[in-house]
Amino acid sequence: MESILEDEIRFKSELKKSISKMNFNYSKKPLVYISHPFLTHGSPEDNLNSVSNVLSDLVLRYKDQFIFISPIHNFGTLDGKLNYEDGLKICLDLLERCDGIIMCGDYIHSNGCMKEMELAVKKGLQIWKLEDFK
């Protein structure tokens, strides 16, 4: 029993040393959240295709200025596995870590997008419409 405990202590100590030696080179580019309807107006597949096009266009055009993140790509596979409120909470948790938000698609009629915009306003994040990037 003691050898297992000693092994665990040794492992944690070595892990701590290796992490402290790592040279993390974090990007200074703003992290921008792509807000797009998922279940509103159209099928999830149609909305995934739409936001996929938006994401690839933005990354190809602005890869040197921004890092873009799409909650639909991160969490879309959880549709039907989480209730709406829990799914939205996960998206809002991600948005909390971002520097800005881009409102896309028919966001005005999407409850989720409007909640995301509400949080962005509350946090003082930069808010853009997709048209601002054209």
Residue map of PLM features:
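Conserved catalytic or regulatory cores that recognize and/or transform ribose-phosphate-containing ligands
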Residues: 1-134
